[in-house]
Amino acid sequence: MTEKLYDKDSHLKEFTGAVLSCEKTGENYTVTLDRTAFFPEGGGQQSDRGYIGEAYISDVQIKNGEILHFADKPLSVGQAYDCKLDFDFRFRNMQNHSGEHIISGIVHRLYGFNNVGFHLGAEMTMDFDGELTRRQLDEIEDLANKAVYENLPVKAYYPTDEELKSLDYRSKLDLKENVRIVEIKGVDVCACCAPHVKSTGEIGIIKILDFEKYKGGVRLLVKCGTDALRDYREKYKSVLEISNLLSAKQPEVSLSVVKLNEQLSAEKAAAAALKKRLIAEKAAGFAPQTDKTAVFEDGLDIKELQLLADALCVKAGGIRGAFSGAGGAFSFAICGEETALEDFFAKFKAAFNTRGGGRNGIRQGTVCADCAEIERLFTE
């Protein structure tokens, strides 16, 4: 049985461990040690990573009670190696996981909701079996950070059977023996196998970034500690860039973006109105000499092409196509009586590299061809 050093000291960065076994598994080697500080994936948290000697450990799993280290190099059985954790990675995981305990404890105490899902990978999410509002989440976030400011001790221990009976603790599983408890006094008591910070002050900050309804409850996206700092830094850079672009004070950036969006919407509406006038004028002056016509106009989207083709068809009948694009690539809409249009569009697709379709007297899509080639087909 491997001695679990991470159970005794969550801040242990280096240790010496003897190799009990080393077996090749695919491209890696599966290694067991007599003692390890590497935490295996579990409880929603990803495993530690680091080095055993010169071998890089990319993953750690526990199977049938055995802790398996996945190494990129073989190691000698019976030899003791200096081992080193990627402690920045471990500490980041501990900050987030301990932050999750604080939030879960507060949610349970205030609203009676249970944490029914937890994942800590590149992002951290937690699921609760009841819905929470933005205002409630703000209150939870304030209380969570208050617990951080108080720098409360985080205690991990194995209670006796008698002690366990008297404990009111959170647990997703019905555990009977070897229950490891992580306690943050006055905030949370929870069964957990993972390493945690020694005191809440090490977490630094807890930030609830987003939430969504999920399976009758709510899913939270949360960042703690270093992750929260990096997130703030990146968002601050974005706010600063937007502030400079809009010549707006940082607290007024949101209002400035709203005003800019309103201006853009007004300009889009004005442009759409002008295009509708263009379409109407184009149709009013349309006097074709043949029963098929291709018209080319710059800057029209597919809906505007549909309007133009339909207006031309209403004015003069026959089959009328509207095209917009450049460099031999066009969006198009073609209107006409369905039976005649179906026959013509079959020839159109056979002649050109065309993507599109439709029904009820209209076909639309994209085509790669020269203007002259398209016009030639419409005059045949």
How would you name each of these model-derived features?
Residues 1-380:
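A glycine- and charged-residue-rich anion-binding loop/surface
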